[in-house]
Every structure is written in structure tokens, then in C-alpha cells.
Amino acid sequence: MHTERQKHIRNFSIVAHIDHGKSTLADRLIEKTGTLTEREMNSQVLDNMELEKERGITIKSQAIRLIYKRKDGGEYVLNLIDTPGHVDFNYEVSRSLAACEGAILVVDATQGIQAQTLANCYLAMEHDLEILPVINKIDLPSARAEEVKEEIEDIIGIEASEAPLVSAKTGLNIEQVLEAIVDKIPSPQGDENAPLKALIFDSNYDSYKGVVCHIRVKEGNIKPGDEIKLMATGKIYEVTETGIFVPNFMPRAELRAGDVGYFTASIKNVRDARVGDTVTGAKNQAKEPLKGYRPVISMVYSGIYPVDGAKYGELKEALEKLQVNDAALNFEPETSVALGFGFRCGFLGLLHMDVIQERVEREFNLDIITTAPSVIYKIGKTDGTVVELTNPTNMPPVSEIKYMEEPIVKASIITPSEYVGAVMELAQNRRGVFRDMQYIETTRVSLNYDIPLNEIIYNFFDVLKSRTRGYASLDYELKGYKSAKLVRLDVLLNGDMVDALSMIVPEERAYDRGRGIAEKLKGIIPRQLFEIPIQAAVGGKVIARETVKAMRKDVLAKCYGGDISRKRKLLEKQKEGKKRMRQVGTVEIPQEAFMAILKTEE
């Protein structure tokens, strides 16, 4: 079923490695089609969160409708669905791609193919999308367009001889990209009279309308007043508004098969409108949902505590507000002896965690302390039950543990060939299991490893970058669980265990890690008037110790000359005081201490 209207629609997204110029290319397409006036154009239109602009990354998917008039007078609707490029947001990317028929693959002419270029490209291929390579940054003197074309053909195996050579920065050859979109990307198919079937590829919360669902209609149509059903949750709502993105919401009478747009239906929470869910009619239902939906799984957990305990309520509100727009964030209250009341939060990955923490501080003006991130371990107990452990302090006693499993990821690292040795050494140090390696071209290699997620969280990326002078790129996905010998490493300050500093480490590494942490903390914890022992312990046995020396307060300053016994009396008194102080004194732990645990040197 292919109507005349559908022949003039193209739905596509742009995929690329970080910094290859995806958002800039989107800006040029928007500008070229005259979608926004010059006054409304600001750079990176689709990255509208302050943080996105600052870090130069795309966090949320966005969509925009472009109208392109060809020279022969034909008018086409191009729906551009922008995707996040970072590996944490992999699932969001896959849902955005499922809403399209084609993808533009942007490759930097100076850098060639990188790990996420490949990862995103394979994702697009899994969705049977028509892939359109575009080579960007050809205005740079170091551009090597022809070699990059060969690379694309050899590695990805798609025809690249006619790939447009563009410069998104200067706007060179952007017209060619628009022509290629119309010529190469297939138009949507789908029966407008069939029962409604639409894919939610994103949702966001609007304080007036409730949840706004961004959808691609696959079959049927949707208009205000319709009763719809969300298939994953089974809930039924009445549609209050439908419309399109220009990039702001613009109401329309209806959306039909092939369209990309949004609808609102007084949905209260983003969790009810899950990304990847299928929307269908409440009465005239589709037989089965669109495939590929899965609930979002948190990979990394971290504790977030207010610096001022009285702000607990405000922190809760802040997290609730962020959660309304971010279904991947989950949190539950937890208490720590050291930090008081706070929340254990689950995130998609390290970048997601960073972004949320920064947004809490920025948008809600809260000072927070965050504990070192941890992954989910599975523990089989002797009584036959299996528990999931997200917080190291909740680890059951050793006598109750039968086995422990940790998450393993499939990591692919692309690096210049002269650094292969350094990268392999790093992966082996991190308990990586070598799978295979392929040469991409004579100078670049792709290495595949299975590595515990625990090791990746632990500054893997930073070390990888420094060992390869910033040239290597990394992509990973969860593979499954594998049993391992793990122990809990506790940190004691002044004889008291600080629960927020506990971490789970492989048994054979406990000693090194313990020593590293003790040394690191020694440099961070401020000196007090009494000395503070820092101890690392496993199962009650101390394995490393450092001491923060006491500051000396000169109690003899007011004695000029005079009798030695007078001085001795003052010194004895000071000694007594220090002893008492050590018993009741508490040690202030600065925020850096929690993060420093992650950064102990290799």
C-alpha cells in the first residue's frame, strides 16, 4: 500500500561517532531547507539542553520536519530524527532508527571510521535501513576523502563512491545530501486504513500537556478524540492533541501512516509511555506490537546524598522531576552511616550518571555528594536464593555466599596499530578475555574483548585514551554474567568503617587496590589535630594502612624561658586532649575522596 502522499515523505536519521559533525550537519540541513529563519537558528538546534551544548553531545533524541523543494518543483517532507551518539544511550538510538527508513552515516574525512561509527552503522543495518554515507570536514587540510571512501567500502561494505563530500561547517555541498536523501532513501509504506500501529521513539514531559509522545505512525492513523492503548503497559488513554515538530510542537488534525509527529493524551508519567512501545487503537487493535521493545535496564548504580541533610526532600523532588523526563533513571532511598540519608540511583552508564549528577546540581541548585559507581552483582546464597547486589554494603556474610557473578561486556576497541601492545596490556590487566582482532586498514586495528563491566567503570576509558594519545575509541554492550571470585574491600578511618567507601573487587586484586586507595586518601583527607589511621580491610583483616599525620598546635608559644616542668605539664595536657579528641573526633571526608577510589593509578 503506497499512497501518493507517502511517496513524498522521507524518514531518516543521522548516525556518527562523537565529534564527527552530526549535529552541525543537521543544522545545515535545517538552514538549507529554510525551516527556521536566520534569527531562530542557533548552532546545534536539536541539542536544546544547556548541558548538551556545553559538552557537545546529544543526550535526548529529537525530531524535526523539513520541507525540501527540488529543482524540478517536487516538494518533499523530510523527517529528521536526531539520535544520541553515545554508547550509554544505545537503546534510544535503536528506537530512533526503527522509526526511519534510512540513515545518513557521517564520517569525518580526517579521522575515518571509529568504534561508534561501526556500532551505530551495524545498528542501522539490523533495522534494514538504507545507509547513505556522507564524508564531512573536507574543508580541513588533513582530509583524506578518497581513503575514507575505500575504508567505508572495505569495512562496512556499502557503496561509497558517490558519497557526497561536504563541509557541514561551511555549508559546502549540502544540496547534494538533500538530493541523495530523496533519491536513495525509500519512502514509507503502510496501510492508512489498517488498525493503528505507531512506535514511540521518545517522550518528554510538558508541564501543561502532560507527557508528549514522539511517534512514527507505521499503519493506520491517529487524531484527537481517539481512544488508544499502549501495548507494553496495557493502559488506555484518549488522545488530546496530535501534531508535528517544526522543531517546536505544531498541532495538526491527524497523523497518518508514514508520518512522524507527536501526540498527547494526559499521560502523567514518562514511565507509562515507554520508549519503544507500540501505540494502537483501544477498540480496533493491532494483532501484535512492533518488535524490538525492551524495558530499560540500569547498568551502573551510585549513591547520591545531599551535603546538607535537611535538603533530603529537595533532592527527592529534583530526582522525581528528572525522572519524569528520563525513564532510564531509577532511584530508591538508602541510608549510610557516614553520609546520612540519600538515594541509590541506577543509570544506563557513566555518561548518563555524570549528566544526571550535573543536572541535579545545576537545575536545582543542590550540593550533593556522590559515591563511587558500582555494577549489579548476582549472588547465589547457600539457602538457594539468588540476590542482586547494587550496593556493596549490603553484601551478605561470606558464610552465606555460594557463588558470585558479575556482568561482562563485549568491548570493541579501535586503535592505531602502533598502540596495539599497550591496549592489549590494558585489557589483560583489566581481566579482559581476548576474542579476535581485525585490521581495518594497514594502520588501524579493531580489537574485541570480553571485559567485566566493573573494570570498565573503573577509569578504563581515561587510561585507554592516555595510552593511545587519545586516538583509540571504545564501544561496548552487555553480554551476560560470569562467575568470579569477589570480595568486599572496606575502608576504615580512625578505626570506623566508612560504608560509602566500600567497594567490591576481585580477590586477587584486593591487596593492590587497598593499598592504592589508602595512599590516595592520605593525600586527600585534610589533617586534623590528631593523627588519623586509614586502613583498607577485607573480611575484617586489615591489608593496608596509611596515617594522616596530626597538625601540631604550639602550646608552648606563651612560655618564654621558664621551667621545663611547666612546659611538660602543657605538653602532657595537650597529649591528653588529643587522645580524647581522637575518641570523639570525626573525620570530614571531602567529595574528592569518593571519586578518588576510582582513579587509583594502574
From Swiss-Prot:
GO terms for biological process: positive regulation of translation. It is an enzyme of class 3 (hydrolase). GTP binds at residues 19-24, 136-139. It is a peripheral membrane protein. InterPro entries: EF-4, EFG_III/V, EFG_V-like, EFTu-like_2, G_TR_CS, LepA_C_sf, LepA_CTD, LepA_IV. Its EC number is 3.6.5.n1. GO terms for cellular component: plasma membrane. It comes from the Bacteria. Keywords: Cell membrane, GTP-binding, Hydrolase, Membrane, Nucleotide-binding, Protein biosynthesis. One of its GO terms (molecular function) is GTPase activity. Gene3D superfamilies: 3.30.70.240, Elongation factor 4, C-terminal domain, Elongation Factor G (Translational Gtpase), domain 3, P-loop containing nucleotide triphosphate hydrolases, Translation factors. Residues 7-189 form the tr-type G domain. SMART domains: EFG_C (SM00838). SUPFAM superfamilies: EF-G C-terminal domain-like, P-loop containing nucleoside triphosphate hydrolases, Translation proteins. Belongs to the TRAFAC class translation factor GTPase superfamily. Classic translation factor GTPase family. LepA subfamily. PANTHER family: TRANSLATION FACTOR GUF1 HOMOLOG, CHLOROPLASTIC, TRANSLATION FACTOR GUF1-RELATED. Required for accurate and efficient protein synthesis under certain stress conditions. May act as a fidelity factor of the translation reaction, by catalyzing a one-codon backward translocation of tRNAs on improperly translocated ribosomes. Back-translocation proceeds from a post-translocation (POST) complex to a pre-translocation (PRE) complex, thus giving elongation factor G a second chance to translocate the tRNAs correctly. Binds to ribosomes in a GTP-dependent manner. NCBIfam families: lepA, small_GTP. This is Elongation factor 4. It comes from Clostridium kluyveri (strain ATCC 8527 / DSM 555 / NBRC 12016 / NCIMB 10680 / K1). The gene is lepA.
